[in-house]
Amino acid sequence: MRLSDFHYELPPELIAQRPLAERSASRLLCLDRDTGALADRRFRDLPDLLNPGDLLVFNDTRVIPARLLGVKRDTGGRVEVLVERVLDEHRVLAHVRASKSPGEGVVLWLEEALEAVVEGREGDLFCLWFAGDLPVIELLERHGHMPLPPYIERPDAAEDRDRYQTVFASRPGAVAAPTAGLHFDADIMARMRARGVETAAVTLHVGAGTFQPVRVEDVSRHVMHAEWTEVSTQVCDQVAACRARGGRVVAVGTTAVRSLESAAADGELKPFSGDTRLFITPGYTFRVVDALVTNFHLPESTLLMLVSAFAGYEPVMQAYRHAVAERYRFFSYGDAMFIGPQEASDKMQETSGRGERPRFDHEI
């Protein structure tokens, strides 16, 4: 397929710049994976769309305050650092923005408190060593800014420390939030438990590469960025138990999808820990995931391609056109979708006005 196939027109005012007052107050566009039917709901309705015995799989990564501002110590030239990956207690791989790229040995003075030395480069990333006795994770927690996406056109604020983080975040390492999880609050979690829905957690540390545009028109030539993920033995056992009782595996976010599908790359779900470059486009055969909770994604993005692979290209693009027409809020702080098979959608009222089942382009 072509990159331009995944373009859609989005009025800028639909890009959410701040979170709603309540996490679960977001809207929820439901797309029936079997029929293409659409329904406009609220996110707090999600427990009613799940069945007892279903397994919800979250990404438990925690966003680190990975953005640092400062200067080159010797010249005073401004720099902006975005940590991509923490290597050990003192070293990181980072994107460094400056008028002139800093060379090996250059000292950066960041947030008027931190000293970092450029040790070298790995491709587009810089290897930085942070001085001091404290681990770099703690330094970032004290001095860093939350790495809001580039389409949020405001400085980070105190509320972002809480709201650009899921309520179940526990393993620091991401530089972007797994945004489908941002809608869940304590009430939603309690209602799902009461309904008999089980939960599991994988980890995928979302990298800044998630915001990088696809630069080739033939999407099959795109090289996916690497992100670290882990799927435990416990999660594999939970998925097997879910299958045995006839439940559905519901991934919360595209990162949970990529974690699970990476761990099942040879056809069987197995424990996995390491980097994944899994790039899912229409034509991909899903091995683990039956339903998906996801936000609305950027035009021409790899995430939109993944969702199109899961639910069919035409139904997804129709759903996006509907979302624009109905003034849904888009991207990280925006609204969500629930994409499930027909048995998850018995309460849906079709809004698309189509009586004919659409063709799903799984063989593109």
Curated annotation (Swiss-Prot):
GO cellular component: cytoplasm
Function summary: Transfers and isomerizes the ribose moiety from AdoMet to the 7-aminomethyl group of 7-deazaguanine (preQ1-tRNA) to give epoxyqueuosine (oQ-tRNA).
Keyword annotations from UniProtKB, A to Z: Cytoplasm, Queuosine biosynthesis, S-adenosyl-L-methionine, Transferase
Pathway where it operates: tRNA modification; tRNA-queuosine biosynthesis
Primary gene name: queA
Principal location class: cytoplasm
Residue segments, region Disordered: 344-364
Annotated GO biological process: queuosine biosynthetic process; tRNA wobble guanine modification
Source organism (scientific name): Thioalkalivibrio sulfidiphilus (strain HL-EbGR7)
Domain of life: Bacteria
Reaction(s) catalysed by this chain's protein: 7-aminomethyl-7-carbaguanosine(34) in tRNA + S-adenosyl-L-methionine = epoxyqueuosine(34) in tRNA + adenine + L-methionine + 2 H(+)
The protein, known as: S-adenosylmethionine:tRNA ribosyltransferase-isomerase
Subunit-structure text: Monomer.
InterPro entries for this protein: QueA, QueA_dom1, QueA_dom2, QueA_sf
GO MF terms held by the record: S-adenosylmethionine:tRNA ribosyltransferase-isomerase activity
EC number: 2.4.99.17
